């Protein structure tokens, strides 16, 4: 049996899921004393050693034995091993997972495994992880595997250069982009008014998500990144809630009063802008060809497969926030994924829009190139103050001249280095016809429901 240990993942709750500067969550795999099967072995599932039972309350991402037998990150799945990818309770597959994998096998898809859901979430699991949807995710992963691997390699290389005291700078070979007269494609009507978004809304909480959508704000950021604690249970709940919201069908039943709360009609509801997980986060409950799928691919692909056509037809999307982007090559990757998705789902080119969060010091030097790469799919750029400041710690932590003072007193938009960053983003966006939006303010609108004291309001003026 193979034992997996996952490190560098934050489990402290909403708002702490994948903070700025988080390094990639690597998986280290080592054979257990019982002896691990090797790639290519024909395995009789009944002969495999029993899995140790764990408490249903155990954190999915705690790093304990996940119940995955015979494969690890980067290790090809044995040809006879298809139905042994267990849920976090260490039991045999649930009927929902069994049906899913059998359906995939009937489609001649043998290299995809998805963890079983908690029993109480089987209906939602069936609704989100349909065979066609999972096959779509897998196809996306295979298509972009090479580009993603190269992107992650370039990140490691850049970090090594920074550790060697290299400093970032503006790119000399992209002068033609910076001197060109291009602009982004016109924005859809629903993105023309960007005064207020409610940000970092935890997706697993249907009541809070509905409160945000019905609040009267212009937009809602449904957050699978910083506002998401990526346990398997919360991920299933979050994906189902967001997909239903994107379809305009999300409801919540108050357990005390029995009242059923529904979304307002599209014209009165806030526009949904989902934020997939950042590139450094992996979804350890789904594997394609023996490799853990990136969380960003799972979030984006499932939302688009189930709700992309509906959002486009109704004029309410599909719109996304793209977080933790560091270079224009990463923006190009997102643009390629958008274009591929539009082709596969028979959507008009450019209908998917993405707002890139410039929340990393490296990205601030390539903001114009990032906007250029996404110009057909751009919904503008966003300034994330706290993540941007944190990126100085992540990238220059070994250099004493970059030590920051007390952030509660001195690190704000009045600081010179923060003003320079903000003004650069505004200048670029205004020149290129793109919205430049601001960061989050922890305030509640007057008369807001006090049952949601942690529901933040984000002010995002086009002119900041």
Question: Predicted regions: what is each one?
Answer:
Residues 100-143, 166-183, 188-192, 198-204, ...:
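Conserved alpha/beta-domain cores
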Residues 6-10, 36, 42-45, 56, ...:
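Serine/threonine-rich intrinsically disordered cytosolic regulatory regions enriched
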Residues 6-9, 80-114:
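Intrinsically disordered, low-structural-confidence terminal and linker regions
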Residues 153-170:
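Short linear, low-complexity motifs centered on an aromatic residue
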Residues 14-22, 61-64, 68-73:
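Intrinsically disordered, low-complexity regions enriched in glycine and serine
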């Amino acid at each position: 049996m193979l034992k997996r240990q996952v490190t560098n993942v934050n489990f402290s709750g909403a708002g702490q899921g994948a903070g700025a500067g988080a390094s990639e969550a690597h998986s280290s795999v080592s054979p257990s004393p019982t002896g691990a099967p090797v790639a290519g072995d024909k395995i009789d599932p009944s002969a495999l050693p029993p899995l140790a039972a764990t408490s249903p309350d155990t954190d999915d991402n705690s790093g304990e034995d996940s119940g995955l037998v015979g494969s690890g990150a980067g290790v090809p799945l044995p040809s006879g091993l298809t139905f042994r990818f267990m849920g976090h309770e260490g039991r045999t597959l649930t009927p929902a997972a069994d049906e899913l994998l059998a359906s995939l096998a009937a489609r001649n898809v043998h290299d995809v495994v998805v963890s079983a859901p908690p029993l109480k979430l089987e209906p939602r699991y069936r609704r989100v992880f349909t065979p066609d949807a999972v096959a779509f995710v897998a196809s996306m992963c295979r298509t972009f595997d090479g580009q993603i691997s190269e992107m992650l390699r370039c990140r490691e290389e850049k970090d090594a250069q920074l550790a060697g005291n290299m400093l970032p700078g503006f790119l000399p070979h992209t002068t033609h982009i910076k001197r060109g007269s291009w602009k982004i494609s016109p924005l859809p009507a629903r993105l023309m008014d960007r005064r207020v978004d409610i940000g970092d809304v935890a997706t697993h909480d249907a009541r809070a998500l509905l409160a945000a959508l019905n609040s009267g704000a212009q937009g809602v950021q449904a957050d699978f990144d910083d506002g998401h604690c990526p346990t398997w249970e919360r991920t299933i709940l979050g994906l189902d809630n967001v997909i239903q919201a994107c379809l305009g069908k999300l409801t919540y039943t108050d357990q005390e009063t029995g009242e059923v709360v529904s979304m307002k009609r599209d014209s009165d509801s806030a526009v949904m802008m989902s934020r997939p997980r950042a590139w450094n986060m992996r979804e350890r409950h789904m594997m394609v060809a023996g490799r853990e799928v990136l969380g960003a691919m799972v979030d984006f692909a499932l939302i688009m497969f189930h709700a992309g056509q509906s959002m486009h037809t109704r004029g309410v999307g599909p719109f996304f926030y793209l977080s933790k982007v560091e270079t224009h090559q990463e923006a190009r990757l997102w643009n390629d994924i958008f274009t591929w998705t539009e082709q596969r789902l028979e959507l008009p080119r450019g209908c998917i829009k993405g707002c890139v969060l410039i929340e990393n010091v490296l990205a601030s030097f390539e903001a114009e190139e990032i906007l250029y790469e996404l110009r057909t799919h751009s919904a503008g750029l966003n300034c994330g103050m706290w993540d941007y400041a944190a990126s100085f710690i992540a990238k220059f932590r070994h250099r004493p001249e970059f030590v920051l003072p007390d952030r509660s007193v001195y690190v704000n938009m009045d600081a010179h280095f923060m003003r320079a960053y903000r003004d650069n983003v505004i200048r670029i966006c205004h020149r290129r016809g793109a919205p430049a939006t601001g960061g989050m303010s922890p305030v509640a609108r007057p008369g807001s429901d006090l049952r949601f004291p942690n529901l933040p309001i984000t002010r995002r003026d086009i002119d900041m």
